[in-house]
Amino acid sequence: MDMNSFSPMMPTSPLSMINQIKFEDGPDLKDLFITVDAPESHVTTIETFITYRIVTKTSRGEFDSSEFEVRRRYQDFLWLKGKLEEAHPTLIIPPLPEKFIVKGMVERFNDDFIETRRKALHKFLNRIADHPTLTFNEDFKVFLTAQAEELSSYKKQGPGLLSRMGQTVRAVASSMRGVKNRPEEFMEMNNFIETFSQKINLIDKISQRIYKEERDYFDEMKEYGPIHILWSASEEELVDTLKGMAGCIEQCCKATEKRMAGLSEALLPVVHEYVLYSEMLVGVMKRRDQIQTELDSKVEALTYKKADIDLLTEEIGKLEDKVECANNALKADWERWKQNMKNDLRSAFTDTAEQNIRYYEQCLATWESFLTSQTDLPSEEDSEEKL
């Protein structure tokens, strides 16, 4: 009885049609394609770091060429994120992966860590490229096209240390004062962010725990195959049965490993990305409130400084325009982000559910096939005795 011949026909899952559903309709008008790949390790006397190759292909007229290739390190991505937040304080900037080592990893720059970060950086740049406003940001263009020396020179053109410190001080002062009359729609938005943050963090923890338990289950199960093989050597009457069980366990181990890969590639990164998004949203709301707080302080000052009415009136007019622009930008980006979030999470959970169904179908079919073969054994022995 050859247990390697077990290849049970897997029933076609009715959920396979889900793969045919497209959540985002509309014509493909993409004209900017970005790939992050080819990580390289660099060791100096001061530090060790990784750079990634970024290949950009585009048909946009504002670019000097149709294809660019540069190398960037994580600090460059941080710089880009900061410049985008500075230029568009109330737009929802995609999150970067954490700078420090992910919990549970032994080596900071092992292959799994580097590949996980590469995927996250790739998604970060492509989310910016797909954003209707951020994609045309000048700093983003420079990031994609400038060589290392050019980028270093470009960075030095930004605001000086004192200017950045002044912005930070004003931001802290505004946060201490707090916003007095936040519009109702932004109160609702803030409540949504708080609730979403709590739930997505809980989902992230549960997902990580499920993956850990799945890993422990897999590590334990893969030991049972060899145990049954050794057992069969001392049980002559049960050789075929024990070897058959070992074969089934091996097949279930392969199915479990595939399921774990699906969790680590399809579900865990998406859920964790939206954990980081929830933190980004808190920052966006603070920056919106800061703009409104500046307006409120000028209005309040106007009541005490009659002599400077004309100057304050002009400043108030500018701040009213700034608040209106900030509110409109955030409201438009908020709806876009919510739709993307729903699509991403729905797709991640749907894919995971379908993978789970396939996993259980495969394991069930494996054991059913084995049990059927064992049920047929007595009749075969009886027929041999009759002969």
Swiss-Prot record:
InterPro entries tied to this protein: AH/BAR_dom_sf, BAR_SNX7, PX_dom, PX_dom_sf, PX_SNX7
Annotated ranges, domain PX: 30-151
List of residues binding a 1,2-diacyl-sn-glycero-3-phospho-(1D-myo-inositol-3-phosphate): 73, 75, 103, 117
Molecular function as annotated in GO: phosphatidylinositol binding
GO CC list: early endosome; early endosome membrane
Subcellular location: Early endosome membrane
Keyword tRNA-binding in record: no
GO BP terms: positive regulation of autophagosome assembly; protein transport
Membrane topology: Peripheral membrane protein
Subunit note: Heterodimer; heterodimerizes with SNX4.
Function: Involved in the regulation of endocytosis and in several stages of intracellular trafficking. Together with SNX4, involved in autophagosome assembly by regulating trafficking and recycling of phospholipid scramblase ATG9A.
Protein name: Sorting nexin-7
Record organism: Mus musculus (Mouse)
